[in-house]
Amino acid sequence: AKVYAKMEYKTLLVDLAADAAGADDGFSRYLAGAAKEDAVKASVLEDGVSVISRCVLAENGKELMASKTLATFLAKKEEEYDRVIVNAPDLKGCADAYAVAQLCDRTVVGCRRTEITGTDLYEIETTLDNNAVRVDGVVVYGN
């Protein structure tokens, strides 16, 4: 996201992975149908990236990422921004993450070297393939 912003693309990062420190609950309430879209507040980082984050506590255990509301929201944001980047939850622990991947034009899988096995990668690749998600790359990071 920062690279796109430095290239002067209007960039939005939608962080669905977890609660961000101080995340506003407006986005989660909107996804749950308890608030209108104007309740969604983006924070702007010093590098110019706009960020919208989930507030998981506000979701009361509901799986909201596979919703039509999120799909519509992302489509609207694609019209407003040059680049919309979605940080999805861990594919190993959240079935909704696969639904989010289906909404994206491109998918890059990131995994920590010490927490992933070849079997995990095979299962993730197979599930993404079965869901017609094109994987553009895999980034393995960490010690």
Residue map of PLM features:
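P-loop/Walker-type NTP enzyme "switch/lid" segment
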Residues: 2, 6-83, 90-102
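Conserved beta-strand/loop subsegment of P-loop NTPase cores
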Residues: 12, 52, 104-143
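Short glycine-/small-residue-rich Rossmann-like dinucleotide-binding loops
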Residues: 89-90, 112
